[in-house]
């Protein structure tokens, strides 16, 4: 999962990157910046998923918005907030207390707050389904791009993502980093 990407959730192997990549069927994309703050937006219609996304970049936060999420598939559609090597504890705010997440935490509520490696994440909205987890993962960069050596790498990984469900219709999200 790459942060900010809305895609199908699958445990299947990643496709090997070839010379040809399916292109976005929509050409709407743009942004503006004063060098410190900025706004960008794009519409995506690619690989069976449609979504409109925008980002507002400020001095100390990024507001991420998505709307019109839809797909026709039997796979769950997710949007990743974060996936990185674990550096310290992943914490969730519950009833005013920061609690450590040691495995997987899943909740459906109007607001969730997380903290990892000096970065805070806030999700909110109507019944947002959010998953946060710390898990040991193994893989080979060679499986993604064959220019890398075929050796396995193992690491503790922090993942935070929103679940939009199977075959979502007009779903949306909003989160702050």
Where are these regions (language model features)?
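Catalytic and substrate-binding regions of extracellular carbohydrate-active enzymes
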Residues: 1-105, 110, 119
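Short helix/loop capping segments that flank catalytic or ligand/cofactor-binding pockets
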Residues: 89-91, 123-125, 131-134
